[in-house]
Amino acid sequence: MFRAIPFTATVHPYAITAPRLVVKMSAIATKNTRVESLEVKPPAHPTYDLKEVMKLALSEDAGNLGDVTCKATIPLDMESDAHFLAKEDGIIAGIALAEMIFAEVDPSLKVEWYVNDGDKVHKGLKFGKVQGNAYNIVIAERVVLNFMQRMSGIATLTKEMADAAHPAYILETRKTAPGLRLVDKWAVLIGGGKNHRMGLFDMVMIKDNHISAAGGVGKALKSVDQYLEQNKLQIGVEVETRTIEEVREVLDYASQTKTSLTRIMLDNMVVPLSNGDIDVSMLKEAVELINGRFDTEASGNVTLETVHKIGQTGVTYISSGALTHSVKALDISLKIDTELALEVGRRTKRA
């Protein structure tokens, strides 16, 4: 429905002209009651400012002139309803972020949801509604949908992978869109996955380049243990292994020395076969060799088709970069009440 009102509607600067914003990676907390009350909250980060990322998305859309199409076609004093529509089946994610965006553009907009983050929606379902100034609804529309479609796509694939991987846990990686690290990882949590390290700061992850530079697995582990002790740091430590021999080398080091090691990555120990199946015998052997002394993580050749078999090997975690680096957005839309188009036409003498 629509209705004309006296011209008191809030028209946010994004609608007219927006200053150039730079994301400040500060530790300012995002104050939003919706976010704070969620069961699945965004993961913690010491410097990431979610609100500034949201503002940057609005600013890059508005440019220096604002929405010139809205200015030309939508009366500033018009109110309307707009409905969120699922155009395919999937898991919805990004509801809390959408509310933040609408509130930033126009605090008077009223948003109502019929589902929660993490709920499954089916094609054709109207799952939310926005009421208020039509001009501002349309300005916020694309930024809201960009975040929600990406997050929902990540959550949908994560849910499928997490269910198939059981009893192992599914993890994403740091292969996220630049600037959207926290948003992507939040979507993984909403989809039922778990987060790998947030960045370079919250976990030591010894990979092939570190091992080569240090002169071997044992020397790399020793250097890490010394560094953590000297700097009084208590964080998780993971080391990458690619062969059974490297697993034995790690276990040999750990048996002789007190170590901060918490997890062993078993990289590319899943071997694709010509018939489309996978050979997980090396992965099983490594898991049995470790025998619960450390958490284990399978990595490499992880797909929706292979993850169930990998999960049956006894690994603790399975990591997949595809959860965030190859996102298929969930198709959803936000449609203003169709009667609005006629009203706009009448007001502008185009109908």
Curated annotation (Swiss-Prot):
It is found in: Mitochondrion. Expressed in roots and flowers. Pfam families: QRPTase_C, QRPTase_N. Its main location: mitochondrion. Its EC number is 2.4.2.19. It catalyses: nicotinate beta-D-ribonucleotide + CO2 + diphosphate = quinolinate + 5-phospho-alpha-D-ribose 1-diphosphate + 2 H(+). It is an enzyme of class 2 (transferase). Belongs to the NadC/ModD family. NCBIfam families: nadC. This is Quinolinate phosphoribosyltransferase [decarboxylating] 2b, mitochondrial. It comes from Nicotiana tabacum (Common tobacco). The lineage of its organism: Eukaryota, Viridiplantae, Streptophyta, Embryophyta, Tracheophyta.
